UniProtKB/Swiss-Prot annotation:
Lineage top rank: taxon: Bacteria
Listed name of the protein: Malate dehydrogenase
Organism of origin: Chlamydia trachomatis serovar D (strain ATCC VR-885 / DSM 19411 / UW-3/Cx)
SUPFAM superfamilies: LDH C-terminal domain-like, NAD(P)-binding Rossmann-fold domains
UniProt cross-references to Pfam families, sorted A to Z: Ldh_1_C, Ldh_1_N
Amino acid sequence: MVSQTVSVAVTGGTGQIAYSFLFSLAHGDVFGLDCGIDLRIYDIPGTERALSGVRMELDDGAFPLLQRVQVTTSLHDAFDGIDAAFLIGSVPRGPGMERRDLLKKNGEIFATQGKALNTTAKRDAKIFVVGNPVNTNCWIAMNHAPRLLRKNFHAMLRLDQNRMHSMLSHRAEVPLSAVSQVVVWGNHSAKQVPDFTQALINDRPIAETIADRDWLENIMVPSVQSRGSAVIEARGKSSAASAARALAEAARSIYQPKEGEWFSSGVCSDHNPYGLPEDLIFGFPCRMLATGEYEVIPRLPWDAFIRGKMQISLDEILQEKASVSL
């Protein structure tokens, strides 16, 4: 039985990530099995036929939670009165394209989306950004939507967290459920910071199970950092199904939190407990409070290895921010 209904927008609705995510969303994986969904699926003009096909499949899925499905090429219609938005659509990096070119193209897209959110979305709407470069895209959208709460903008680092979680599980030869406090800091890029020093295995410090520090620093960390490129090289396309699952999990950690769960998210750095510059979207370990708000987990120690990686990631975020104009 549906106890409430949320209005949700998904952009990039004809893309691979959205295609996987929409069915997970419709099944109740994000908001729960008692929450109805008023769904708006957006993509750019020219995609109308493909959007209609996505709607057909959702209709054919006969999902009880879907109260309404609207497909549109209007951001105003997509974002009108929404409770949550999943900003998936972006320009992918093409052959010969420099990162600065990608930042410029996507900066324009997310500035436009931020302005539309500012005009039409609910003030307390939660915004989950997936399109890369995700930290900077999220920052651009946030700063173009000053009416919305800055704390409710999230850049997805959950896929990085999941990759690290899986690698630690395999190395320790334990179930995924035995591994906890997996943390990824900083930028979602090859300079992200997979922080194994906080992780627990069977509620014990990781070093008691994985004593090989060289493997952690020189195999695991760079493997997580470069996993996206490895997937592209292997399948010829970027991560889609795993990214969609990570997005569903990232949102579920906020809407249906587990007691004591840590999750990594790129959030606004204003008033952060680590003294990092404000007005950034930076990956932090977070947890939900009884109030329904999240907090950045404070007072986690950084050893020399992690501190060095943190500075590299911070410098990259600052460089990206400096390269775009609001």
